[in-house]
Regions:
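PDZ-domain C-terminal substructure recognizer with occasional recognition of PDZ-binding tails
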Residues: 114, 136, 150-191, 348
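C-terminal "post-core" interaction segments
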Residues: 3-8, 20, 34, 191-485
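Bacterial Sec-dependent signal peptides at the C-terminal "C-region" and cleavage site
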Residues: 16-30
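PDZ/PDZ-like domain segments forming the peptide/carboxylate-binding groove
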Residues: 93-137, 141-144, 210, 350
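Acidic/histidine-rich, surface-exposed loop or edge segments in extracytoplasmic proteins
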Residues: 25-28, 41-50, 199, 416-425
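Interdomain regulatory linker/hinge segments that flank or connect interaction modules
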Residues: 38-93, 158, 171, 440
């Protein structure tokens, strides 16, 4: 019986490792790979025979295969049956979890999982978890060395069950513990608004799905009916999604048949080209794209493609500009390939290349206008500014008695129930304090003014960027400072 187990292990490991080896000939297996796979099988057999504790072969094999795939790159990993099943379930857009948006750019070696946002009305928000909190433990299990895919399965589960997380929060010396009851979470992939006073349309995409395609198309068709001044496309914190959705959305801006992205294998051979198949919708109006360090993968492709086509002038009347900070730099393609025992592997098989034959892998996309995000004051800083640094904070300050106008007092509970707010209501509040959004609005207004008063300054994209940089002070604008004699 042990010989049969040994041979099964040997054949499985040899096949897995053999598929990963770089070989010019497909008829033979690299001798070194063969030798080491044989050694691996021997170790398993000896462990099973001689170790004091009974070996759990299935768990050991899955961990070993995951460790092997992790040595290739941080995005390749082994999907255990439960992880693979939950991954397939989550594609429906509805699942039972705690209601958080996570940092998908996390590395497996990281000891924490950053929460980018919470779902309004979800379990996490109800219990007081905040954006940018960092989860360090889930049900007493540390996160270091665990893939993000597996961590998400720990957070998901049947409705009504509980999960306990320990959270590290900025300015808090101790870890915070939350016990959350899982509930149905309906993900919100997009939000759109109309800025009436500025006559600007705003659209935020958190991921790329077919629903996102429909939302972008509906907004652009509505915008083209009006004499709008510009569109702001918010790709901040967008970690990617469906590539065909990106191609469809790009097709709304660029000439039909334009190649959006190509993929190349490890030999540099082009494996796929993805051209647009539709006619563009956007009229002769600027589009400003907000990006940050959490803009990754498919979101980077869309930002990069629109920038390149605008620079080339290959699409008439495409005026695309990037605002914010450098993107994440994930330009690799992963395939989820089912294997036996209800498992799968997520394997990096190729790299994305933009229309100018450059890759974003490890490089990212640079914005045209660097604008760092300034966050609203923390609770501690709000208290500090209210209690210090003003005349009224002195104990014996002179008071001027002014009879205030009589105004009805608002109920104390008004606006306190944050959990009841919808996505759009909370987004409106956040956008009011968003300096990057305000920079985009300023640039749209600046471009509109330039087209009227000095159109010669904005005839090309290069000239337009130069003109706007001269008139907008951003984080990367050098200041010439001279001493007054």
């Amino acid at each position: 019986m042990k010989k049969i187990i040994y041979m099964q292990i040997f054949v499985t490991v040899t096949t897995l490792v053999g598929l990963s080896a770089i070989k010019k000939s497909t008829d033979t297996v690299d001798q070194m790979t063969y030798d080491w796979s044989r050694t691996f099988a021997e170790v398993l057999q000896l462990t099973n025979q001689k170790h004091y504790k009974p070996a759990v072969i299935d768990e050991a094999m899955m961990n070993a295969m995951d460790a092997f795939l992790n040595t290739l790159d941080q995005h390749s990993n082994f999907l255990k049956p439960k992880v693979y099943q939950r991954m397939m379930e989550s594609t429906t857009g509805e699942f039972c979890g705690i209601g958080i948006v996570i940092d998908n750019t996390r590395k497996e070696k990281d000891q924490h999982l950053t929460i980018i946002d919470t779902v309004p009305g979800g379990p996490a928000e109800k219990e007081g978890i905040e954006p940018m909190d960092k989860i360090v433990e889930i049900d007493s299990k540390a996160l270091g060395g665990i893939s993000t895919d597996e961590i998400t399965t720990w957070l998901k589960g049947p409705r009504g069950t509980t999960v306990t997380v320990k959270v590290m929060r900025k300015d808090k010396p101790d870890l915070l513990t939350f016990t959350l009851t899982r509930d149905v979470i309906k993900e919100q992939n997009s939000l759109s608004f109309y800025l009436k006073d500025q006559n600007i349309y705003y659209l935020a995409l958190s991921t790329f799905s077919q629903n996102a395609v429909n939302q972008v198309e509906a907004l652009l068709k509505q915008a083209t009916k009006n004499k709008y001044r510009g569109v702001i496309l918010d790709l901040r914190n967008n970690s990617g999604g469906l590539l065909n959705a990106v191609v469809d959305i790009a097709g709304m801006f660029v000439t039909k048949g334009s190649v959006i992205v190509t993929t190349k294998d490890k030999e540099g051979r082009v494996t796929n080209r993805y051209p647009t198949t539709r006619n563009p919708i956007l009229a002769d109006m600027p589009i400003f794209i907000l990006i940050n360090n959490y803009t990754a993968s498919a979101a980077e492709i869309l930002a990069g493609v629109l920038k390149i086509h605008a620079q080339r002038g290959s699409t008439k009347n495409l005026h695309a500009f990037l605002i914010g900070t450098k993107t994440f730099g994930k330009g690799s393609v992963q395939e989820v390939i089912p294997v036996s025992n209800n498992c799968a592997i997520k394997l990096t098989t190729s790299l994305y290349f933009l229309p100018d034959d450059t890759t974003i892998q490890g490089i990212g996309i640079e914005p045209d206008f660097v604008v760092e995000r300034t966050m609203p004051l923390s609770e501690q800083m709000r208290w500090f500014t209210q209690n210090y640094g003003r005349e009224e904070t002195f104990k014996n300050h002179i008071k001027v008695h002014i009879t205030p106008e009589s105004t009805p007092k608002k109920p104390l509970t008004e606006g306190a129930d944050q959990a009841a707010k919808r996505w759009s209501e909370r987004a409106k509040e956040l956008l009011q304090q968003d300096n990057q959004l305000r920079a985009a609005i300023t640039l749209i207004n600046l471009l509109g003014t330039a087209r009227q008063c000095c159109p010669a300054q904005v005839t090309t994209r290069e000239k337009t960027v130069q003109f706007m940089r001269e008139h907008l002070i951003t984080n990367d604008t050098p200041l010439t400072i001279e001493q007054v004699p």
